[in-house]
Structures are given as C-alpha cells and as structure tokens.
Amino acid sequence: MRLVVPYLGEIHPVDRRLVRLAEFLGIDCLTIPLDKSAGAAPEFLERAIALREACFVVNPCVLQGWLGGDTLPVALSSFLVTHFPHLLIHSPRLETFDSSLINLLSRGHLQAVRTIGQSERFYDISPESRDICDPFAGLSFGPTNHVNDQVFSIGHEGPELLKLISIAGQPFMAALQRDKSKIWFLAGQDVADLDAEIGDAPVSEYFSRLLPHAMALRCIFGEESWRPLKQYASVIIDDPLLRRNYGFLNFESLLALMKQRNFHSTIAFIPHNFRRSSPEITRMFRHNTERFSLCFHGNDHTGAEFASNDAALLNTLLWIAEQRMERHNKITGLHCDRAMVFPQGNFSLEAMAVLRVHNFDGAVNTVPYPMHDRVRLTLRDIAQPAVLRYESFPLFLRKDSVHTQSADIAFNCFFGRPVLVVEHHDVFQHPETLADAATRINTVAPNTCWSNVGAALRNSVLEKCTPDGIHHIRAYSNTVQVSNRSSSVKQFSIEWNQRSHPEQVLQDERQPVTFAADGMGIHLDAALPAGSSRTFSLVHQNPYSEFGDLGLRRKTKAYVRRRLSEVRDNYLSKTPRVLAAAKKLQRSLPR
C-alpha cells in the first residue's frame, strides 16, 4: 500500500512535511499532479491512480484549488469513499469549502472546524484508542498549541464516529468507517518539520503537529511501517560503590522497592572502584540479576574526562576502564554491560568515535550534546531509539524521575526509545519519587521489559515487513539479536544507519557474515530457521594510539577526587549547610 498525495503545480508545504514523516516511518509515497483541464474529477483520479490499495491524502486547500467553488462535488465524495480503503483529511481551514468537505465525507457526523479557546488547555486521548494511539491511550496532558490546534464541531453523535483525541470534549482527531473507506480526520493546521530544532521542548509543544499524523499513518500501514519491536526500561543509578550503604542508598531497601514496584536498576559503576566492592552486595547482585546490573561510568570519574578531544588519551582511558571491569568480573562474578554513562554528562565527538571502535553497544546521557558543541536536537533525532548524529555512534537519552512524566514515557514507547531513568543516591532520601516514576512507566506501558541497560540498548530496534515477506530490522546498538518466532523459515534484512563502516560483522560473536556498506549505512541479509535467534555484532578496527602511562599526578588526582566524593555523598550530604559550603569550595578549586 502507498500514501497518495495529490498536488497542484507543486506539493503544498504541509503535504511535503507529511510525505517526509511518512517516509521517515518507512512508508512508500506517491505524489500525483492534478490537471485542471482534465474534465470530471473522479474519472481523472481513476486514470491517474491505478492503485486500489492506497491511502489518499485530502488537503482541502489543494482540492479547492483544483476544483474551484465552495463545495465538494457529491460525485467526487462518493468516488473517494468507494475507491480508496483509507482517506486522510488534514489541515482543514475555516473556509466554506472545508466545511462542505468535512460534512459530506463524515455524513454529517462532523462539521466545520473552529479554533480553540484559551481555557481549552488539555489533550484527552481516548482510553479505547490503544490500537491507534498506542501508549498515549488514556492520557490527558497539555498545554495545547493555540497556534496550531482546532477542533471539529459535531453534527450528530454515533457509535461509528471514533473520537480519538479531544480538546474540551470536541474531537481533534477522529476516525469513521464509511462504505469501503476508513476516513481519518485531523483538525491541526500544520504538520511538524522533522528537521526543525526542538531542543528540550516538552512533548506538548509539538504533539499535535506530529503524533496524530504518525498514529494515523502507523495504523493505516500496519506492519509495512517502522514500529518498535518491544519496549525496554531501566533505572540508572550513578556513582555508588557496591556496599550496603552509599549516601542515602541502601541496597537491601532498593531491592525491596524494586520487587514492590517492579523495576530494574543498573548501577553506573566507576571502574576506578573495581577493588572495593563488598562480597555481601556482589552476592546480592548475582542472586538478583533480574533486578541489578552494572554498566560503565567513565573510568576515574574525574572532571569531564570523556569531554577530551585527545583521541589517544580517550583510547587509553577506555582501555584502562575495560581492564578494570574485567578484573572486577573475576573478583565478583558480575558482568558489566558495554554501555557508557558519561561522568557529569560531559562528552566529546572524539569520545563517541573511540567508544565505537571499542565496540561498545552505545552511550547513555542526560545531556544531549557534546560539551564543546551545544547543538539543538531535531524531531528526527529524538523520534527514534537513539541519536545518531555524533560520529554515527548511538546516544540513548535519559531523564530523572521528576521529568519522566506520562507523556514523555508514551513518546519514548511510541518511537521505540528505551525509557531510561537517571538518579543518584540522594533520591533515596525520598524514594517515593523514583517509585512513582516506575509506576508511571508500568501504567503507561504495562508490557515494558525491565532489564539491564545493555539489553535495553541492544533490543531497542524498529521492524517492518514488506509485501515480499521480508522482515526488516533497523538496529541502533552495536549488537542486535534477531528472532524468528514463527513456525517457518523467514528472510530478514538488517540495517544500521551508520556512516562509519565496520571491519566485519559477526554472527553469534564468532562467525563472520557477508554485509554491504554504503553512504546510507550497513546492510545484511539472513535466513533464520523457525524458532531460532541470531546475534549480529559490528566489529570495528581501532586506529587510535595509546597515551601511555597517565602519570602519578593524574592518578593521585583521581584517587583524591573519589575519596572526597564519597565523603560528600556519605556524610556531607546528610548535613545540608555543610554540603552547600563544600560545593562552594569545590567550585572555587581548579579542575
């Protein structure tokens, strides 16, 4: 099936943005030039569009420019609802023609659009809309966008009219089955530009220009559009030593809380501390792998250590960190996921490149840009599992508990982003803050798989199936597991949208497989027997030299910083005035 977009002269800007969104979702599009001199509209469209399996886009401005007049011809209305299985009506205006079109195609269920008032502040998503609105179903949030948002006036109610998204009880997004056609009505004036910079804007700021269109398109095209395979989540707690108590954190209490509220905690572990883990707590981790795990948190956790532009230094730091965590594994039996959480949220482009050639699965960060290049992310960057603009290495974003609200969770789930929650020991002074965030995640996405952060990164993939029966997998992490859960052999096409090319791709960590690489990314094909799984990993060659010995001064600085940080977390943090004075003193010292 294809999305058919008619145009007059040139594609209308709002339709062009819709096409870009559809293509971003993996949907095939066909643009059709309209001819004013072609005679009767139905006959022209039937000649011009041979496809029967299509979704026809109805932009009232375009149709009126083609047809003229103030009303939609009845003959054209009848043709549309009997010829196309889906109609997508969007960007209606406060015009007589638009009112005629809406009224005629909806059989009077909907009439004209109107702008919303200042008091109409919330989007209410129908609880019965999960098959269309996915994790947004049942949510209510705002504020609405008074520049973009309009609502339909209701002519007469009826069970056949589905009010999917409403503002103050009036439909903003609706659907209706008529004859052979499912008709989708979107009241927003505009479609979001995927390449527009949005920075850290809240979901509500761009929701009405992006999500209703994406919801409709994904529902219309089903498995032929990109969609998440499964939803993953993990709480990441930065810094603590693996001892019974660290600051306000008590691991026994955390385990009880995780069991009560159903979540998983990944400890962002500082490799410098590899000799200092308590046997009692490492035993607890080994016996509760479904609740506890580890990932990398820098090397020494010195100030901005991974924001350096010196690739040789970064290469050395990573080599030391890996050696330390291998020794920690031998001492404790605990595996450390190959995911990097940057200390203080600071990183450089060079750090991303070095992580890539060390074959890490990905980086996780709260700050979405390099320390020395404060770019603003676009909708395209955030409407997929990971940000790929930094040296083609995946950056997975996280938020703290307070900022992990229901709309943020739903956005992540809709676009396949793992829900990663960041906290430090001090959240356990009031642990209900974290517990409530876990409950919100489990409420919005009840089928969430709580896991270690490594599994969350590796399994946050998109999939679609094309009419030829090939299952397409778009991977973001360095490693991806592909499963055939059917009872027959299936063909898979696996892709990474990375500009940097690996030396080889390994199947199940040992067998090289044939792959293709070009300017668009990395591709390979695989046939999987029924009920089987395969793991595919990119293996990069490391071209960087090592820095050599880091020197006594750096080692001493790292040692002192770690001990002072522990004094701060274990003692000063429990005396606010002393902690404030210590932080002031810390800021005055050279880094």
Give the location of each predicted region:
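Aromatic-Pro/Gly-enriched surface loop or interdomain linker
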Residues: M1-R52, M258, I267
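A glycine-centered loop/beta-turn motif at secondary-structure junctions
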Residues: R2-L3, F24, R52-E53, P85, ...
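Active-site beta->alpha N-cap acidic-glycine motif
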Residues: R47, D200-E290, D337
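A glycine-rich, often tryptophan-bearing local segment used as a flexible ligand/cofactor-contacting loop or short
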Residues: V62-P135
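Metal-dependent polysaccharide deacetylase catalytic core of the NodB/CE4 family, i.e.
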Residues: F79-T82, L88-N103, Q111-T115, H264-L355, ...
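Catalytic grooves of carbohydrate-active enzymes
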Residues: R218-L249, M258, K330-V341, G345-F347, ...
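C-terminal beta-sandwich/jelly-roll accessory domains of carbohydrate-active enzymes
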Residues: V453-A456, E463-R591
